[in-house]
Amino acid sequence: MFGWIKMVDGMNNIQEKKVKYIMDSKELLAFIKQHSENPLELLVETLNDFKNEKGFEQDLLTPGFLKEWQVSELLGHICHKTKHGADATNQEGTENYEYLSCKDGGSFQLDRIHKGNLHRIERNTKFFFALYDKENGLKCSKIWEVDAAVVLAEAKVKIAKMKESSNHIGFSKEWVETNGIVVYN
């Protein structure tokens, strides 16, 4: 989008200059509210169209997908195009990455994990733990990188201690800080 601004030079001459204008999220929302009977539907459809342009095959509202996409963008990784396999790869496609996220004050959860499917950890080179702001759950405040071998060792310890009915293991922020390195802040 372009607009015109008036500028005054040193001789008090007024000139108009064409400039590129980028609106922020609040301005975009105000515009959409003015021009749509159903702003929510338009916003979701727009994000879905953007997702499709990027080549993603999975449903926009698949749990975890938007944060995985966001983390991959922040770290310069290639986000998976389907829900199968690792969450992302490096630019060359030679390393697989898994992303875990939580809000500040929570713990990073690895769901549906047990002795029989440790390949979900082993297929990865690294894990990235993304911490989101407690008040604004869309704002990623910090990301740590942890080698998959370290995550696997901890997962085996946790699995050995957990009840048969539980298939979720958690990693505390303290564990991540101790075992990882900050790659985004």
Regions found by a protein language model. Give the residues of each.
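Nucleic-acid endonuclease domains
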Residues: 2-185
